[in-house]
């Protein structure tokens, strides 16, 4: 592909430069192959301009970025006003195939579940479907584990192109605030956007909640085209801001939840009742009532399911078929997932690693703890330090027994992280070794108790210093149960 085809007029007026043949794209100099266009991006930790020489030595045919380097280069340099946006659009042109129907979901919590639920609904309706997000890529034909909620534009567009070649016609993906703020999602032809909720998160990246919300709103202001669907959970303080952004873009508004527009295009939750490890729901859509049994635990999973249903309906699926499909949903891995029991007490694993998510998980499980609700959790290092005491206070208020442990301490002192949590959680126990904490919590379970192990969910690593050690909450639970059975 020609340089001009990838960068447009930014490639300049020199016909020889514009006609340079590009065989690939790269943002990491270590991944450059001969013939690649290297994007020298500046970031929070380093400046890509430092690696231009290495990229050229590896065979880069041209370099694109912000202000040009002060020294002459042996290959063309293209100066870009917005290098990150240009990268995303170039990736979309280099990997041009996309499913006909694409839904993106943003919000603090629930993105993974909504993307998974939307994929499952479409699959139930006989569409070849996929989802991309925190747990990676999942489709009818492939599952690829990932570590980023929103991959970099090259990886994202490559994945989208590949699954389209596989025959995928419907895609649901997570739109993180980082991904939106850094233009990683631009160039994706989004049919509908969904919004779950907003609470404190990523305060190590966003200076305040207003900046965080504005990053989320890019989905509705810039990515979903006019006439596309905007599915918004209407039960939150910031919902009005999201609705306003959607209406300003002339999107088809669908509100869901207890304040959803059930008389119109939205979905109103009329009633919900616990039914074992499921919930009986009464819903209203376009004035018609529907009664379904949702096989999921927790009010927040109802919200997630309704956003997913809205995305499916908003992209053309039959409402009756969509609501019937809700009765077959399976929770995403590590999202309030029932993984075992001891002495009749259920054991759950949940990804909750922020204050609001921890509160919702504990509140969801309270009805299942006739005796005591137990939680094991920690907080990540090199991340928002302000949430640690908040999570400690929430655990102390919502649970009966609290064990504070480690959760990806990274470069920080694990004991200091635990101390910040414990300061707000009087009576909590400290067991730094996560496997030991899980073992102790399970060993102490009595009939009528319920245990949730929070923070990691689907993850299979414990980051200590600069090293990622293999660790899985699922495996730790299995090992603890096996040890007690032997």
Predicted regions, residues:
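Active-site regions of enzymes building and remodeling cell-envelope glycoconjugates
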Residues: 73-81, 144-147, 250-253, 428
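Phosphate-binding loop of NTP-binding sites
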Residues: 86-234, 240-251, 369
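Non-catalytic positions within long, well-ordered alpha-helices that form the structural scaffold/packing
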Residues: 52-57, 164, 186, 366
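Residue-level signal for inorganic ion chemistry
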Residues: 6, 36, 55, 90, ...
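N-terminal leader/targeting and accessory segments in enzymes
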Residues: 1-93, 229, 237, 268-272, ...
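ATP-dependent carboxylate-amine ligase
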Residues: 1-15, 34-37, 43, 47-50, ...
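Acidic, Mg2+-coordinating active-site environments of NTP-dependent enzymes
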Residues: 3, 68-73, 166, 181, ...
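Receiver (REC) domain switch/active-site residues of two-component response regulators
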Residues: 61, 191, 400
């Amino acid at each position: 592909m020609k340089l001009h085809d990838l960068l447009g007029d930014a490639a300049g007026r020199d016909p020889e430069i514009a006609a340079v043949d590009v065989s690939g794209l790269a943002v990491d100099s270590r991944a450059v192959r001969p013939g690649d266009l290297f994007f020298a991006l500046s970031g929070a930790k380093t400046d890509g301009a430092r690696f231009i020489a290495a990229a050229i030595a590896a065979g880069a045919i041209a370099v694109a970025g912000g202000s040009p380097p002060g020294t002459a280069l042996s290959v063309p340099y293209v100066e870009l006003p917005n290098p990150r946006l240009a990268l995303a659009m170039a990736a979309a042109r280099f990997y041009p195939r996309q499913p006909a129907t694409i839904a993106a979901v943003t919000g603090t919590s629930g993105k993974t579940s909504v993307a998974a639920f939307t994929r499952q609904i479409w699959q139930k309706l006989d569409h070849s479907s996929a989802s991309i997000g925190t747990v990676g890529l999942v489709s009818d034909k492939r599952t690829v584990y990932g570590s980023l909620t929103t991959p970099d534009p090259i990886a994202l567009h490559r994945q989208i192109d590949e699954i389209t070649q596989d025959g995928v016609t419907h895609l649901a993906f997570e739109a993180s605030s980082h991904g939106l703020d850094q233009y990683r999602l631009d160039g994706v032809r989004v049919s509908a956007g969904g919004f779950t909720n907003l609470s404190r998160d990523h305060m190590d990246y966003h200076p305040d909640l207003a900046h965080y919300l504005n990053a989320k709103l890019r989905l509705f202001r810039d990515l979903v085209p006019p006439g596309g669907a905007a599915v918004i959970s209407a039960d939150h303080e910031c919902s009005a801001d999201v609705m306003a952004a959607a209406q300003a873009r002339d999107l088809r508004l669908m509100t869901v939840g207890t304040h959803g527009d059930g008389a119109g295009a939205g979905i109103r939750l009329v009633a919900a009742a616990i039914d074992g490890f499921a919930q009986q729901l009464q819903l209203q859509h376009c004035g018609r009532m529907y009664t379904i049994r949702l096989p999921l635990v927790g009010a927040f999973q109802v919200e997630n399911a309704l956003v997913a249903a809205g995305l499916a309906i908003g992209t053309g699926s039959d409402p009756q078929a969509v609501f019937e499909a809700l009765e077959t949903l399976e929770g995403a891995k590590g999202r309030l997932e029932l993984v075992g029991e001891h002495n009749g007490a259920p054991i759950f694993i949940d990804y909750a690693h922020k204050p609001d998510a921890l509160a919702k998980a504990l509140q969801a499980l309270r009805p299942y703890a006739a005796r005591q609700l137990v939680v094991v959790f920690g907080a990540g290092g090199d991340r928002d330090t302000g949430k640690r005491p908040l999570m400690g206070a929430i655990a102390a208020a919502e649970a009966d027994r609290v064990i504070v442990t480690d959760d990806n301490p990274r470069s920080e002192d694990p004991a200091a992280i635990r101390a910040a949590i414990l300061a707000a959680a009087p009576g909590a126990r400290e067991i730094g070794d996560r496997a030991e904490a899980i073992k102790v919590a399970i060993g102490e379970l009595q009939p009528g108790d319920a245990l949730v192990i929070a923070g990691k969910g689907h993850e299979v690593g414990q980051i200590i210093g600069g090293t990622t050690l293999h660790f899985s909450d699922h495996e730790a639970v299995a090992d603890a149960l096996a040890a007690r059975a032997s």
